[in-house]
Amino acid sequence: MTMPPFTRREFLKTTTAAGAVAALAPFAPRSLANAGADDAAALPAGAPSWIGKTSRWAQLTLVEDDPGKYDLAFWLDYFQRTRSDAACLRGGGCVAYYPTQIPFHHRSAWLGDRDVLGDLVSGCRKLDMSVLVRTDPHATYDDVQAAHPDWIAVDAQGNPRRHWASPEMWVTCALGPYNFEFMTAVNEEIMSRYRVDGIFINRWDGSGPCFCVHCQENFKAATGFDLPRPADSSPQDPARRAYILWRQQRLFDLWGLWDAAVRKINPDSRVVPNTGGCALSSLDMKIIGERTAMLAADRQARHGLTPPWACGKNAK
C-alpha cells in the first residue's frame, strides 16, 4: 500500500494521534557542533551499538482488537514517509500480540493464529530500523488473580485493587513476583523470539503503595519497619524515609534483573524503563542517568486539545 507524501498539517495530526516516544540518546547533553563523529565517545561505557544511530522514533501502541483490523502495510509506509529510523512496538505484558507460550500471558482475543508483533518487527528490519518492544506489566486479568492472588496490588485496607479505568482488570504489584518472575520470563521470550534491540517497559514502577504480603515481608526484612500507612506518616517519619529508599532500590534491582536477562540472550540489547516526565519521576534521575545511555518518556495524546509539541516539551 503506497500513499502520497504527508502535508505538514497531516503529519502533525497523525503523530499526535499515534503517540510518541521521546528518546534522549545519549543521556548526557551535547552541542550540535559535537554531533556525528563524536557520538561513540559521548556514550556511557557499554552502550549498545544502535544508540548513536537512531534519531527519529515512531511508536505504535496497539490496542487489543487491533490484530483483527490493523493495516501492516499502512504503518510500514508511515514509518518510511516520516523517515523514522527506529520504532517502539507494543508486544506484551497486559496483552500479548504474538503467540506467547507463557502461562497467564494474556493473548489478544483477536490474535487468532497471527503474529502481529513478529510481522511488525520483520517489516521494520527490512526498513533497516532499530526496534524496541513495548511491554506493560501494570495490570492483569481474573485468571491471574485466581491463580496467583499474591501478584495483585493490595490497598492499605487489605483489599486487592481493581483497575481504576478497566474494571475487568486487576492492578499488579510492581515489587513482587509478578514483575521479578513472570515479567522476566515475558521479556526473555520476546528477546528469544525476535532478538530486538531492546525492551521498553511502560508503567513498571507501580501504581501507588502496595500492601501485599510480599511488600510487607520484604520491607520488614530489609528495614525492620512495618509498611507506613499513607494516612499516618510524614516525610520525616523514619519508616516513610526508609520506604522511599527501599522502593527505589527494589525498582533498580528489578531494572538490573530485566536488563541482565535480555542481554544474556542478545548482548547488544537493553531494557529501557519508562521515565515519564523525568523531572517528576519519583526515582533519582542522577542514578538513572548513570545507569543508561538512553531515556524514554512515553507521552500519549489522550485528549483532543493536546498540542503536537507536547512530546518535545516532555522530553526537555
Regions found by a protein language model. Name each.
Residues 27-54:
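C-terminal segment of N-terminal export signals and the immediately downstream linker at the start
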Residues 4, 10-31:
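N-terminal export signals
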Residues 143, 207-210, 251, 255-265, ...:
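Substrate-binding cleft/loops of secretory-pathway carbohydrate-active enzymes
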Residues 137-194, 229-244:
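Active-site-adjacent "subsite" loops/lids of carbohydrate-active enzymes
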Residues 82-114, 139-151, 215:
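Aromatic-lined carbohydrate-binding/catalytic grooves of carbohydrate-active enzymes
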Residues 44-95, 127:
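N-terminal structural segment of carbohydrate-active enzymes
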Residues 58-69, 100-114, 165-184, 237-252, ...:
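The substrate-binding groove and active-site-proximal loops of carbohydrate-active enzymes
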Residues 57, 85-89, 116-163, 200:
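Glycine-rich, aromatic-flanked loop segments that form ligand/cofactor-binding clefts
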